[in-house]
Each structure stands twice: as C-alpha cells, then as structure tokens.
Design a protein with these regions (language model features):
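Small-residue (G/A/S/T)-rich helix-start motifs and N-terminal tracts that mark the onset
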Residues: 1-73
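Glycine-rich phosphate/dinucleotide-binding loop and adjoining beta-alpha-beta core of small-molecule
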Residues: 49-104
Length: 104
C-alpha cells in the first residue's frame, strides 16, 4: 500500500487541513499519516482562532513518523510561521523526504 504524509493544520469542522487530506488519502487507497502544524477553530464560514504548535513538537511528530514508516509522498499545507517552515525543511532533508507537494 502506498503511504503519504500530510503536514498541515487541523480543521475542527473537517472540511480542510489534515482531516480533508486524510479523507482523500483513504478514499484513494493510500495509508495516510499526519504531522499537525496548528489547531484551528473554524467552520464553513471562517477561521476564528489558530493555535500554532511549537517547532519542537512538530519535529517530534516528524521523527516518530520517519523512524517507523517512510512516506512515499508528502503534502505540505498550512504552515503559519518561518520557524515551522525551517523545522519542516530540516527534517525533510534529514529523512530524505521525496515526492513533495506544496499546497498554498
């Protein structure tokens, strides 16, 4: 089975972010994994709050994933700070991430 990692924010309403990515992966027969960059309070009308995870916690998530199951593809969505971008870049280089898609 193909594997994919989504690195993005969590959408409390389920229509975007990690939740939407995992639904899409499952529908297409892909084993999905996630590293959460932020928690959002949102619904179909908008985003009311964002809680960004620390770079250290994001790095811990990525380490846990890459040291167990190497993803065949990686999708990067919501990243709300330069520090998180640096953390992602360093870890994708460290673990030789491949087939990377950026979702603006």
């Amino acid at each position: 089975m193909n594997t994919a990692l989504t690195i993005a924010g969590s959408d409390s309403c389920g229509g975007a972010g990690i939740q939407a990515d995992l639904k899409t992966m499952t529908t297409n027969g892909v084993y999905g994994m996630s590293a959460i960059t932020a928690l959002t309070a949102q619904n179909t009308t908008g985003v009311s709050d964002i809680y960004e995870v620390s770079p250290e916690f994001l790095e811990a998530q990525l380490k846990a994933i890459f040291e167990d199951i190497t993803p065949d593809a990686i999708k990067i969505g919501m990243v709300s700070s330069g520090e998180l971008i640096k953390t992602i870049a360093c870890n994708l280089k460290k673990y030789n991430g491949k087939n990377i898609v950026l979702d603006p």
